[in-house]
């Protein structure tokens, strides 16, 4: 059976570090030989080859680059920030409504998580660019269709074109690319919809179909609290990769129904060990509150708003009771996964939602002591997925194996830090990790950034752009 890892390898794009390096004019990280931004050839597609052109985004690139004193950093920012628009979006008007399909980059399919995160950094510009606003409205409309097709699926095709995972032992409908149940897949579209509404005041995407999709989200969350049995979802795959299939006959390892929501897979698309995935549950708490607000103000549905709020409260209380665990060194901290019986895992995974990313996603305050204790743990030898080598240090993922650091986790470290030295180290490592390609990657070897995975990973690229824009606003002196 084809796994996602095999799918990437067969596409010839998973490990393209050396070939890209040889084509790149950049062979250094921060502090190396001086080169002007003009010396470094843009890695963007030619104007007529770009999937979408936004004057507001291009102007933002010029504005921010003008404040970046480090030339390498300015060059990478100029390549990365527009990468989603340049290379991954397919816009159309369907039945008189905008529709935007967003691929991840090297995989020709749309993940609910990735697509939401990929366009998120452009939201501050939508009032300046009506076409950009329409594009993101199209993402919301497409996500609505996806959720209504199957709320348990994580990734979708543009149409009923078939999938390399058609033989998975689960209910694969036409149009589904992969059917891995991940709580965050239903959280990200709510986060995107709420921010779009707040930025624009536009409620046109939030029609009857969107409302049906949101009610299906809450229904699915309640099903996966498993108070009345295991629910309708199960998944197995014939594979040599343990994390691509599911224990317990496809239902996951046993849980005690304590109020949290089961997530059979992590945001990395790897199966969970203990099915209550803590960062995803806290993300669900946050977005359920956002959905309650939208229900009251847009849908005028107090009953559904109350349902969202009560579910958020129930999940939050369960997290505080069953997922805050005392560590002998770091004190009370969040476990990564729990089962309600007292079993837990102390670790983190690079993909967001992660424990590290909780303040970035507005799930917990940065000052929260339990979070701060957790954060200290994450960057210690006690975290089995914290790696440190000649090329830098950071959090990795079981998805890519030991010794592989993820740039997304380095960005989350910078987003959640107020320490200038820590942020500067993150920027240095990110530039180093680019390995002369001008782009971010999925992961890189702790000792050799030229050994990286996924040369075209749009979420990481656009997130890097978001980080630089935030620093330009809040700490511009770090970009010199």
Please provide the spans of the model-predicted regions.
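Extended, well-ordered alpha-helical scaffold segments
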Residues: 76, 130-146, 202-222, 291-294, ...
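N-terminal export signals
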Residues: 8-32
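C-terminal capping/lid segments that line or modulate ligand- or cofactor-binding pockets
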Residues: 167-174, 179-182, 345-365, 403-480
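Low-complexity, Ser/Thr/Pro/Gly-enriched N-terminal "stalk/linker" regions
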Residues: 35-113
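Well-ordered alpha-helical scaffold segments within catalytic/enzyme domains
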Residues: 56-69, 117-130, 188-203, 282-300, ...
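Twin-arginine (Tat) signal peptide motif
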Residues: 1-8
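Extended ligand-binding clefts on enzyme/binding-domain cores
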Residues: 112, 148-152, 159, 165-174, ...
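Aromatic-rich carbohydrate-recognition surfaces in CAZymes
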Residues: 108-136, 140-243, 458-472
């Amino acid at each position: 059976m084809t796994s996602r890892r095999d799918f990437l390898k067969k596409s010839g794009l998973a490990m393209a570090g050396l070939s890209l390096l040889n084509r790149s004019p950049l062979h250094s990280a921060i502090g190396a030989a001086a080169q002007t931004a003009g010396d470094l050839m843009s890695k963007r597609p030619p104007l007529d080859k770009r999937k979408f052109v936004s004057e507001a985004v291009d102007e933002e690139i010029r504005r921010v680059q003008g404040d970046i004193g480090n030339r390498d950093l300015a060059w990478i920012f100029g390549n990365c920030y527009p990468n989603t628009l340049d290379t991954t979006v397919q816009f159309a008007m369907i039945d008189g409504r905008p529709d935007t399909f967003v691929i991840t980059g090297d995989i020709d399919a749309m993940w609910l998580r990735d697509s939401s995160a990929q366009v998120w950094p452009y939201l501050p510009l939508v009032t300046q660019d009506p076409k950009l606003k329409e594009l993101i409205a199209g993402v919301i409309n497409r996500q609505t269709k996806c959720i209504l097709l199957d709320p348990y699926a994580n990734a979708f095709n543009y149409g009923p074109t078939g999938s390399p995972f058609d033989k998975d032992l689960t209910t694969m409908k036409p149009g589904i690319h992969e059917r891995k149940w991940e709580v965050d897949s239903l959280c990200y579209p709510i986060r995107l919809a709420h921010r779009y509404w707040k930025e624009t005041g536009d409620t046109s995407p939030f029609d009857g179909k969107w409302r049906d999709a949101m009610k299906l989200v809450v229904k699915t969350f309640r099903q996966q609290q498993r108070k009345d049995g295991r629910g309708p979802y199960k998944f197995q795959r014939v594979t040599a990769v343990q994390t691509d299939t599911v224990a317990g006959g496809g239902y996951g390892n046993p849980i005690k129904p304590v109020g949290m929501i089961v997530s059979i897979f992590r945001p990395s698309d790897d199966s969970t060990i203990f099915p209550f995935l803590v960062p995803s549950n806290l993300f669900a708490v946050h977005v359920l509150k956002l959905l309650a607000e939208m229900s009251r103000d847009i849908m005028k549905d107090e009953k559904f708003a109350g349902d969202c709020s009560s579910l958020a409260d129930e999940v939050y209380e369960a997290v505080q009771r069953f997922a805050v665990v005392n560590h002998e060194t770091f004190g009370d901290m969040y476990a990564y996964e729990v089962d309600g019986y007292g079993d837990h895992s102390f670790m983190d995974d690079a993909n967001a939602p992660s424990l590290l990313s909780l303040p970035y996603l507005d799930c917990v305050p940065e000052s929260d002591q339990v979070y701060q204790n957790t954060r200290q743990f994450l960057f210690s030898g006690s975290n089995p997925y914290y790696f440190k080598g000649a090329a830098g240090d950071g959090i990795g993922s079981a998805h890519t194996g030991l010794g592989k650091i993820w740039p997304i986790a380095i960005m989350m470290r910078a987003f959640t830090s107020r320490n200038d030295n820590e942020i500067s180290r993150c920027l240095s490592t990110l530039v180093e990790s680019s390995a002369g390609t001008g782009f971010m990657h999925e992961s890189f070897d702790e000792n050799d950034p030229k050994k990286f995975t996924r040369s075209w990973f749009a979420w990481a690229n656009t997130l890097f752009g978001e980080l630089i824009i935030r620093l330009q606003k809040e700490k511009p002196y770090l970009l010199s």
